[in-house]
Structure formats: C-alpha cells, structure tokens
C-alpha cells in the first residue's frame, strides 16, 4: 500500500541530535539518515536529517505500527485525510519530536516535528484513489 516514505527532521542548536535520531528511529527503525548542515535566519546552525525508505517490508512495518495507534488518533487521522493528502496521492504526516523521543507516536500539526511524505500505491496516482485506500485501511482497525 505504501510505495515509499521520505522523512525530514530539523535539529536546532538547543536540541540533542542523538536524542532526536533516537526519536526518528522509534518511528522509522531502519532509517538510513543523511545529514546536512544549514544556516538559520539568525546565523544559527541547523542540522537537517533526511532520507527515504522504499523496501516493502519496512513500509509494511510502518503501516502496521501506524494502524496500531490509539483509536482517537486514528479517527483524527481519518478526518484529516483530505487536507493531509495531495493531488498526487502523497500523505503528509508530522510526528511530535518530543513524543517520538519518549517512544510514543503522536501525529501533530506543528512545523517543528518529524515530517513524513508517504507515497501511497494508488493507481492512478490521484488524491481520491489514495484517500479511498487509506480509508479502507483505517476502517479495518476502527
């Protein structure tokens, strides 16, 4: 159901990079992280951690873990699918950095988070088709 998952995480100067990598690995245990340095508006150093997961086994494990979240979180996700899915069938999720570091999954709507771009295997690759597949998967567990 998932073709690939792209992820991105910003580490600011006042954050612990290793701790945030641990949080990312809580959500994506097999992540092979690429590290890039950038400069913020105030000339502060920002580390960008990113990468892509495209192995079927790994994307299936992610989906299984996602669908194991508590009912309230899954119901909120189901109600937000229209605004979290683009016209090409990509699902955009953000996970709380703090919760991820505490080995919990919490979908959030704030910018300072772990960003996931999840390409849904929808044929044709359209928003409506992807949302239908996502609703079907969510309805199996709700």
Write out the residue ranges for each language-model feature.
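Short, conserved charged micro-motifs
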Residues: 16-19, 57-63, 102, 126-131
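Long, hydrophobic N-terminal alpha-helical segment
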Residues: 1-35
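Short glycine-/aliphatic-rich beta-strand segments at the starts of folded cytosolic domains
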Residues: 3-10, 49, 87-93, 116-118
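Short, charge-patterned binding micro-sites
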Residues: 34-58
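Mid-chain, well-packed structural core segment of small domains
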Residues: 66-100
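Short amphipathic alpha-helices in soluble, non-transmembrane regions
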Residues: 21-23, 62-70, 132-135
